[in-house]
């Protein structure tokens, strides 16, 4: 078993190191991650400059490769040029903070898994609710269990899973739920600030609260103490509007 491991928090992130340690007994693990944090990078590729690959020489990250680019860059480089043979699975995470509802459109963590899926590899994105890396050991245990299940009996072929793990001690996690994406309210307005030079700058506002957290959603499952597993697809076609659009064109 060969697993390609990536993230969006950067190669020094605790979530990556803990996930690597949890998955290492399962087989060969290749790590390629961004040099710096790229949260919110979505599926962006770096096209305006060349990319470089480096290798960490010390610490728990020893042997990790890192790229001066985005999460999608990392997986794309690995699968189309760096690796001699394609891995059996792409795993992204563990992200610091949830990726639920519309978050998946912005998430670099999910984007890394999407790139693996686009290139024909089953892929899983793992995120832990809230920030601060509390109970990260529990999240890693959950991630390993899901990866082991996916290896032993793939749910479908190929698959793209978005997994969100409650920020709880392992013994307090109630189990797993297959979920759909919930929905958020619009994000908070941008925050305007004047810098010391008198220039007006803007910070992107916080994500909106859950708008659809009804039963069956990722928001509901995690709020109840369950791990949410959401199967994702990449076809954004609004099929129910096709006929109306065709009539409008005529």
UniProtKB/Swiss-Prot annotation:
* MF (Gene Ontology): 3'-nucleotidase activity; 5'-nucleotidase activity; exopolyphosphatase activity; metal ion binding; nucleotide binding
Annotated catalysed reactions: a ribonucleoside 5'-phosphate + H2O = a ribonucleoside + phosphate
* Locations listed in the record: Cytoplasm
Describe the family membership recorded for this protein in Swiss-Prot or TrEMBL. Belongs to the SurE nucleotidase family.
* Cofactor stoichiometry and binding remark: Binds 1 divalent metal cation per subunit.
Q: What is this protein called?
A: 5'-nucleotidase SurE
* Gene3D superfamilies assigned: Survival protein SurE-like phosphatase/nucleotidase
Its cellular-component GO annotations read: cytoplasm
Q: Does the keyword Cell wall biogenesis/degradation apply?
A: no
Query: Where do the TM regions start and end?
Result: none
Report the EC code(s) recorded for this entry: 3.1.3.5
What species is this protein from? Cupriavidus pinatubonensis (strain JMP 134 / LMG 1197)
According to the entry, what is the taxonomic lineage of the organism?
Answer: Bacteria, Pseudomonadati, Pseudomonadota, Betaproteobacteria, Burkholderiales
